[in-house]
Swiss-Prot record:
Amino-acid positions noted as binding Zn(2+) 1 in the UniProt annotation, renumbered to this chain: 1081, 1083, 1151, 1154
Binding site for Zn(2+) 3: 1113, 1116, 1132, 1138
Lineage of source species: Eukaryota, Metazoa, Chordata, Craniata, Vertebrata
Listed name of the protein: Protein deacetylase HDAC6
Cellular component annotations (GO), alphabetically ordered: aggresome; axon; axon cytoplasm; caveola; cell leading edge; centrosome; ciliary basal body; cytoplasm
Active site per database record: 215 (1), 641 (2)
Compositional bias (Low complexity): 980-996, 1021-1035
Subunit field text: Forms a trimeric complex in the nucleus consisting of BANP, HDAC6 and KHDRBS1/SAM68; HDAC6 keeps KHDRBS1 in a deacetylated state which inhibits the inclusion of CD44 alternate exons. The complex is disrupted by MAPK1/MAPK3-mediated phosphorylation of BANP which results in BANP export to the cytoplasm. This facilitates acetylation of KHDRBS1 and CD44 variant exon inclusion. Interacts with SIRT2 (via both phosphorylated, unphosphorylated, active or inactive forms); the interaction is necessary for the complex to interact with alpha-tubulin.
Zn finger (UBP-type) start-end: 1079-1177
């Protein structure tokens, strides 16, 4: 996707309409017996008849345009899709080491170990080797200063003493006469891969290099790093290859502060770092490494930090080797580690990618992805003290391969356990080469600490990315405590295992294809225009042959299903009933078809249904036996509506269900099977077959329209979760309207489907691949593109060791289903999914459905518990804050767009275009009240910024070596920062604090403010800093007002002095922030009519008699006091579950279940009545 002027990646978050409450038209409600594909309708009036006639005239050209557009999608790009994985590995990179410390962890043995592992696994011969080259000085100057480069160049001529003195002026580095040349060679190696990837010589690549680079700043060595390879590569790609959007992912266990500082003002580079932090106790001890730092100026929102605050802590038992008397053989020797606390595991990293990185990356749409691939988070690394595995990094690599059209480059950073490092590199390289991801250890669910970090990061980023709207939900304190106890119990018994010896099967045939034209003999004898036409499978197969995909697959012969296979899901009576139709006359066939719902039967129906189901079983056999890795079954009639004893919705035998049972029979056990049903209709038959079976996880995304879309009824509702032992293993995502597209399905994948699927950890994935949600389908009314289906398939391919099977269900636009199945086949064959160039934000209706499902299923799945744990009502207080932006620049919003004067948004709310920063918080502060308002202009990253450096150490042990005495340093630093305001500020004047840049490079570090959401923040690169804070007295006064201004407070009048207190002269140019309520919520139906006695907002609290601040329940109309008085309304809500309440103070409406203010037309009557009672007149805008 290209852009001109203001790029879409720098746009301001746009306001979006919330879903409107649907009109309840009784005439539009169909009974269970309605036909599949039928739409609700009522008798047309004259206007509707005219409109229908006009639309009929326009429909033919529109349909033709759609067909032409779909045909124009060029999926036959075999000759243009780059293939091959590049590898740069040069022995010259081992020509430097620490002259004065042979035990220094960054040493040449790291590359030796990697090379041996790659040779052992045969990976070197599978890669395209590239000769490393030296980076030119002009290329280094794209990021680094000339003075710094010249200084590093002089190290070639220094003796050991001089090198040691210079290295001592930096933090955690050593210098060698060859350090400069090797650093230039390392940077040049990455640049060579950039040229190869962007020039389509290869698809992706890896640079196995040293020294690392992500800590290096513009004019500063740091943390073993001299030049920042990826930063130079990003600027190089932008300059030479005209790249406009680059994603840098840093999964090294240390925060890549150097990369962050280089790009923290730049909206063209999205930087994502996931690292060990321990609340600032871990190197590099910076507040800028915390989740609250999101970038500065136009780059705000483009810096993403996920800080890990939990590490492994193990006790061990040691059994020494000994030689029994008379024996020359050594007895058992082992060291067993029992982890009392587990560091972050694969599940935690995967959760961060699914909930944060992938959604933002799909909205950002990078054109190149660069990875700072450090492997010091692997289990056994002495620096990281984490518990990730090589298989986990293979999955992370697989996720990233779906971005930027597959243009992905990994560049080695850290990793200091030689065996773990080598396995980590080989695991990621296997994935780059297209090998399937290994299965992970169960359960794959994030721990409580990871959930907290991810939730904090999401809340910090939500103001800047539309796709993150409603990404975190409120959670009760009791539920949080229960979840944490559950996590502690599970983790307390977790025993660390040795690194698994992962194997990647090298299959000659990757994708199997089953098709038999005999299935076309099933046809409708009475309606030649029936949507379930024999041409469906023929058109798909022809298209696969035309674009060359069929030739790349292994064609497998179809076979009829055996009775024993059919009987695993269907009753014997039903099978015989269908078999009997083979000999029926035409009139009897018509009568028999009418006995079922939306069914036609012909003499060949039974044989075709038997063949379709048998084809699915044949494909299962091929996948489980290793004959192929994955496959597609182009079959008809479809199957997912078929019940155990009844045909339904064009379906006779449930092919996917029978295939699942057949797989379990082959395995001889209850194989864990994931069934994903993306057909636009709910697969009622599949759900009923497995609803009591915990070995099969059934996930369905479908049009529901509140029970009025086929197959009608409440079976597809989110509340249907399974029964008995299968409770929680049925997941329904009901769409309550049309036009759901790629963004809506991807949001569901990221937030719901993949988290649950990874936690379930299936051994086989079956997809009920109906394509009637595709663009142009006459029944679905949705807008999923072929490219969208390619991405959905790619994301599921990381599961079950890549064992995934697509079985055709519905889809009735012949062009759409052909293009969509071809796109899925591309993904199965390992081709990168195409970029989604016109991805809109998810619809509010889709987000509502997703949130509804999460609320239902979070009790069953730990991976869905990314919730707000602070009191949302307190945090969302209605305090108004005035902020003046710098006069030297036009006001800049969170995404770099101009903010209109007087834009009203709420301080601290979740959807502002320019939110105010808040005081940095930790897990222990999660229940604290709203942080004090703070305006910050950043400090220079090239100065001594003591106020933002949590600790400063210069030994080699500090990189990864957290010390226990640093807690006091952190607390002291934060306390001193909080005490910088003066009494003059308390009186309303504001004093600026500045720090001049240091001339000593050895003291350079970040000064980045940790505060998120401040549009006026500036980059640490800008030099002088100035911080404006509310005085401690003003903060206390403001906190005392929270009871009147938060949650159910409604809002007493705020003294104008409070608006400007602490801001001094910053009140001349005003930008206001206030609460933005929801325009709709799903709980409005709980609002009852006003009682006959009327509404009295002056009533006292029914429990305590208080009249200070009360609320009226809009269900029972009882009056109780606010949580800031005696919290009796909160108690009433918890006891009655009545969701909506009205403030007797300012007549605002709060929904406890949505945890938000709501303003909707359904509330106008009660608000008008309250206004009449309170002020003696109706609301002005209603008169």
């Amino acid at each position: 996707m290209t852009s001109t002027g203001q790029d879409s990646s720098t746009r301001q978050r746009k306001s979006r309409h919330n879903p409107q409450s649907p009109l309840q038209d009784s005439s539009a409600t169909l009974k269970r017996g309605g036909k599949k594909g039928a739409v609700p309708h009522s008798s047309p009036n004259l206007a509707e008849v005219k409109k229908k006639g006009k639309m009929k005239k326009l429909s033919q050209p529109a349909e033709e345009d759609l067909i032409v557009g779909l045909q124009g999608l060029d999926l036959n790009s075999e000759t243009r899709v780059p293939v091959g994985t590049g590898l740069v590995f040069d022995e010259q990179l081992n020509d430097f080491h620490c002259l004065w410390d042979d035990s220094f962890p960054e040493n040449p043995e790291r590359l030796h170990a990697i090379k041996e592992q790659l040779i052992l696994e045969g990976l070197l011969g599978r890669c395209v080797s590239f000769q490393a080259r030296f980076a030119e000085k002009e290329e280094l100057m794209l990021v680094h200063s000339l003075e710094y480069i010249d200084l590093m160049e002089t190290t070639q001529y220094m003796n050991e003493g001089e090198l040691r003195v210079l290295a001592g002026t930096y933090d955690s580095v050593y210098l060698h006469p060859n350090s400069y040349s090797c650093a230039c060679l390392a940077t040049g190696s990455v640049l060579r891969l950039v040229d190869a990837v962007m020039g389509a010589e290869i698809r992706n690549g890896m640079a196995v290099i040293r020294p690392p680079g992500h800590h290096a700043q513009r004019s500063l060595m740091d943390g073993y790093c001299m030049f920042n390879h990826l930063a130079v590569a990003a600027r190089y790609a932008q300059k030479k290859h005209r790249i406009q959007r680059i994603l840098i992912v840093d999964w090294d266990v240390h925060h890549g502060q150097g990369t962050q500082f280089i790009f923290d003002q730049d909206p063209s580079v999205l930087y994502f770092s996931i690292h060990r932090y321990e609340h600032g106790r871990f190197w590099p001890h910076l507040k800028a490494s915390n989740w609250s730092t999101t970038g500065f100026g136009q780059g705000q929102g483009y810096t993403i930090n996920v800080p890990w605050n939990q590490v492994s802590f193990c006790s061990h038992k040691l059994s020494l080797a000994c030689f029994p008397r008379g024996s020359r053989e050594m007895t058992d020797y082992y060291i067993a580690f029992l982890c009392l606390q587990v560091g972050m595991r694969d599940a935690d990293y995967i959760a961060a990618f699914l909930h944060i990185l992938l959604p933002v990356a799909f909205e950002f749409q990078p054109q190149l992805v660069l990875v700072a691939a450090g492997f010091d988070a692997l289990h056994g690394d002495p620096k990281g003290e984490m518990s990730a595995t090589p298989a986990g990094f293979a999955h992370l690599t697989h996720f990233l391969m779906g971005l930027a059209g597959g243009k992905l480059i990994l560049s080695l950073e850290g990793g200091y356990n030689l065996h773990a490092l080598a396995k980590g590199v080989s695991g990621s390289l296997h994935t780059l080469l297209g090998d399937p991801c290994p299965m992970l250890e169960s359960p794959v669910a994030p721990c409580a600490s990871a959930q907290t970090s991810i939730s904090c990061t999401l809340e910090a980023l939500e103001p800047f990315w539309e796709v993150l709207e409603r990404s975190v939900e409120p959670q009760d304190e009791d539920e949080v405590e229960g979840d944490m106890l559950e996590d502690e119990e599970e983790e307390g018994h977790w025993e660390a295992t040795a690194l698994p010896m992962d194997t990647w099967p090298l299959l000659q045939n990757r994708t199997g294809l089953v098709y038999d034209e005999r299935m076309m003999s099933h046809c409708n004898l009475w309606d030649n225009h029936h949507p379930e036409t024999p041409q469906r499978i023929l058109r798909i197969m022809c298209h696969l042959e035309e674009v060359g995909l069929a030739a790349r697959c292994l064609i497998l012969p179809a076979r009829p299903a055996l009775d024993s296979e059919l009987l695993t899901c269907h009753s014997a009576e039903y099978v015989e009933r269908l078999r009997a139709t083979e000999k029926m006359k035409t009139r009897d066939l018509h009568r028999e078809g009418a006995n079922f719902e939306s069914i036609y039967i012909c003499p060949s129906t039974f044989a075709c249904a038997q063949l379709a189901t048998g084809a699915a079983c044949r494909l299962v056999e091929a996948v489980l036996s290793g004959e192929v890795l994955n496959g597609i079954a182009i079959v008809r009639p479809p199957g997912h509506h078929a019940e155990p004893d009844a045909a339904c919705g064009f379906c006779f035998f449930n092919s996917v269900a029978v295939a699942a049972r057949h797989a379990q029979v082959i395995a001889g056990r209850a194989l864990r099977i994931l069934i994903v049903d993306w057909d636009v209709h709910h697969g009622n038959g599949t759900q009923h077959i497995f609803e009591e079976d915990p070995s099969v996880l059934y996930v369905s995304l479908h049009r529901y329209d509140r029970g009025t879309f086929f197959p009608m009824g409440d079976e597809g509702a989110s509340s249907q979760v399974g029964r008995a032992a299968g409770t929680g293993f049925t997941v329904n995502v009901p769409w309550n309207g049309p036009r759901m597209g790629d963004a809506d399905y991807l949001a569901t994948w990221h937030r719901l489907v993949l988290p649950i699927a990874y936690e379930f950890n299936p051994e086989l994935v079956l997809i009920s691949a109906g394509f009637d949600a595709a663009q142009g389908d006459p029944l679905g009314g949705c807008q999923v593109t072929p490219e969208g289906y390619a991405h959905l398939t790619h994301l599921l391919m990381g599961l079950a060791g890549g064992r995934i099977i697509l079985i055709l269900e519905g889809g009735y636009n012949l062009t759409s289903i052909s293009e969509s199945m071809a796109a899925c086949t591309h993904s199965l064959l390992g081709d990168p999914p195409p970029q989604l160039t016109s991805l809109r934000p998810p619809q509010s209706g889709a987000l509502a459905s997703i949130s509804e499902v999460i609320q239902v299923h979070r009790k069953y799945w730990r991976s869905l518990r990314l919730m707000k744990m602070e009191d949302k009502e307190e945090r969302s207080s209605s305090r108004l804050v005035i902020k003046k932006l710098p006069q030297s620049a036009s006001p800049v919003s969170a995404k770099g767009m101009t903010t209109p004067k007087g834009k009203v948004l709420e301080a601290g709310m979740r959807k502002p275009t320019a939110a105010l920063p808040t005081k940095e918080s930790t897990l222990g502060q999660a229940k604290a009240k709203t942080a004090k308002a703070l305006l910050a202009q950043g400090q220079s990253s090239e100065q001594a910024a003591k106020g933002t450096t949590l600790d400063l150490a210069t030994s080699k042990d500090t990189v990864g070596g957290a010390t226990t005495d640093q807690c006091a340093s952190v607390a002291a630093t934060e306390n001193s920062a909080n005490q910088t305001t003066s009494g003059e500020e308390a009186s309303g004047e504001t004093e600026s604090f500045g720090t001049s840049p240091s001339s000593n490079a050895s003291k350079q570090t970040t000064g980045a403010s940790p505060l998120h959401g401040a549009a006026a923040q500036q980059s640490p690169e800008l030099g002088l800093s100035s911080t404006l804070e509310l005085s401690s007295e003003a903060q206390e006064v403001q906190e005392s007002e929270e009871g009147l201004l938060g949650e159910a407070a409604g809002g007493q009048d705020m003294n104008s002095l409070m608006l400007t207190q602490g801001f001094g002269d910053f009140n001349t140019q005003d930008v206001f922030y206030a609460v933005t309520p929801l325009s709709w919520c799903p709980h409005l139906m709980a609002v009852c009519p006003i009682p006959a006695a009327g509404l009295d907002v002056s009533q006292p609290c029914k429990t305590c008699g208080s009249v200070q601040e009360n609320w009226v329940c809009l269900t029972c109309y009882q009056v109780y006091c606010s949580r800031y008085v005696n919290a009796h309304m909160v108690c009433h809500h918890e006891a009655s579950e009545h969701p909506l309440v009205l403030s007797c103070v300012d007549l605002s409406t709060w929904c406890y279940l949505c945890q938000a203010y709501v303003h909707h037309e359904d509330l106008q009557d009660v608000k008008n009545a309250a206004h009449q009672n309170k002020f003696g007149e109706g609301m002005p805008h209603l008169q």
